[in-house]
């Protein structure tokens, strides 16, 4: 296992100690990305994942029969490519999950640019045995159109979230929220 190593780009920048289970073994972690016909934006996402501060993870791409060069992009970065028969995001994720044996799975989209410490900041929460899931908002970058920023105001609150194109990291720390 290990972070992505894109061809010709060197090693992932990760130097963070892997998250360990009680037996001292590292958790088997994956980032799962469903996609269909979005190779160029997927290339951007995988490029960012290749530079994560936490590098002990695998990337799984669940591809719903793309007709573009998605598989080539996956090969470029060493991501595992799964051809799935579905035509929607939920089914693509579920199809891939049934084929995976990872203990922690992080989800993102093929048009979301994760911050360079995204994996590290999500994985660290699982050091607490009471944490079962982690999530957060997906903010539009500063240079996105005004309409995307309006969507942030409407959807990216602590009450509900909805992804906007090319999410960027908000300022501040993740905040644990508990539910009964």
What does each model-found stretch correspond to?
Residues 2-48:
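N-proximal low-complexity "stem/linker" segments adjacent to membrane-targeting elements
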Residues 40-43, 68-75, 117:
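Acidic helix N-cap motif at the loop->helix transition within catalytic regions
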Residues 47-56:
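Short, acidic, metal-binding catalytic loop of nucleotide-sugar glycosyltransferases
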Residues 48, 63-71, 112:
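A conserved acidic beta->alpha catalytic loop
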Residues 84-100:
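Glycine-rich, basic loop-to-helix element that forms the pyrophosphate-binding segment
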Residues 105:
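Short aromatic/hydrophobic "clamp" motif used to bind/position activated sugar donors
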Residues 116-149:
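Conserved donor NDP-sugar-binding/catalytic core segment of glycosyltransferases
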Residues 140, 161-180:
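A recurrent flexible, glycine/aromatic-enriched loop bordering the glycosyltransferase active site
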